Regions:
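Outer-membrane beta-barrel initiation region
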Residues: 1-46, 82
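Transmembrane beta-strand segments of outer-membrane beta-barrel domains in Gram-negative
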Residues: 37, 42-200, 257-260
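Surface-exposed coil loops of outer-membrane beta-barrel proteins
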Residues: 25, 53-67, 206-224
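Residue-level detector of the transmembrane beta-barrel scaffold of outer-membrane proteins
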Residues: 9-13, 33, 42-46, 73-75, ...
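Short glycine/serine/proline-enriched coil/turn segments at secondary-structure junctions
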Residues: 4-6, 21-24, 83-84, 129, ...
Length: 323
């Protein structure tokens, strides 16, 4: 919504795993965000709260890792340059995060965190005919001089609370036609490298619906460094369904983690496949004021450590409403 009628935007969201009555597994999250543009600049602020519980593949046996977090943030973004076929975007924000963690249902006192941090990112988008190319990078970290409880790094009791994480990403979207049918290929690559010791909450995690699909997310691989490669091949179903905005798709993902803590994992690489249906439509009788988007899929693990247990196939569904 636009409460001040200044092209500002207020959004409120809540999400959960499908088993709403099971408070011992999965995740819950809620957030509120507000932004207001001024020319090529945009000011934004937000707050969020989340709870999660997952099983991580350990060296000898699975580890049940969980926790809660609360975060407030504010920042600014700017479009430093733009042209008919390209655009650049830069963003800087500061945040305060409070979190606690549990290991096998036991509170980890040394992992209680109350930290102040920052994040800077830069992205460039380029249009080449119908192809869209995205590249970007960023850095995020903590400001220990303003933090009450920076957390604890295993094996480094003298850690000063300062962390620095470098990130990079690249993406390609390529639409094309086969026998008159509209199709598209999309690939996205992401990488993280920790320049300093970091707490487990900042590890790069793979094996869920966001990073290497085909796994149920109850057991994951996580370490200081990592990368993922996500591939999607989609088919426009608008003509077949006589309604625009719907796609069938197939995906193939691979990811790998690394860093000092990866030596304790039973494996470092995951690969998975997924097929699904996604789309967006205005709800009937709502005068286009309410729209719904959905994504339903089935996935399968293709490569994993033997000790990492997951359902197969993995069914996932997402339903979102916009007012």
């Amino acid at each position: 919504d636009s409460p001040l009628f200044l092209y500002d935007q207020l959004s409120v969201s809540w999400n959960s795993n499908a088993d709403l009555r099971n408070s011992d597994a999965g995740s819950r999250a809620a957030s509120v965000n507000y932004s207001i543009p001024f020319g090529y600049w945009t000011l934004f602020a937000g707050a969020s709260k989340s709870r999660y519980r997952q099983t991580v593949a350990g060296f000898d046996e699975p580890i049940v890792y969980g926790g809660t977090s609360k975060q407030v943030e504010a920042g600014v973004s700017v479009v430093p340059y733009r042209g008919a076929s390209y655009k650049g975007t830069a963003m800087l924000k500061f945040l305060r995060k409070r979190a606690n963690s549990t290991l096998n249902d036991i509170d980890i006192e040394v992992q209680r965190r109350d930290v102040v941090g920052y994040e800077f990112s830069y992205g460039h988008r380029h249009y080449i005919d119908q192809m869209v190319l995205d590249v970007g990078g960023g850095v995020r970290g903590t400001l220990p001089q303003f933090s009450d409880q920076p957390g604890y790094v295993y094996g480094d009791p003298d850690w000063n609370g300062r962390s620095t994480i470098l990130t990079a990403n690249a993406g390609l979207y390529l639409p094309f036609k086969v026998a008159g049918q509209q199709m598209a290929y999309q690939v996205n690559w992401q990488i993280q490298h920790a320049k300093t010791p970091i707490v487990p909450a900042d590890y790069f995690t793979i094996g869920n619906r966001y990073a290497v699909r085909g796994f149920d997310g109850q057991m994951t691989l996580a370490a200081e460094d990592g990368w993922t490669l996500r591939n999607d091949l989609s088919l426009d179903l608008g003509e077949l369904l006589r309604a625009p905005g719907h796609q069938g798709y197939a995906g193939l993902d691979v990811g790998r983690v690394g860093g000092p803590s990866a030596m304790w994992l039973s494996g470092r690489t995951l690969a998975g496949a997924v097929i699904g249906l996604r789309g967006r439509a205005a709800l009937p009788g709502a005068a286009n004021a309410v729209s719904a988007s959905y994504d339903v899929s089935a996935g399968w693990p293709l490569q994993k450590p033997e000790s990492l247990k997951t359902a197969s196939p993995v069914f996932a569904a997402t339903l979102m409403f916009e007012f």
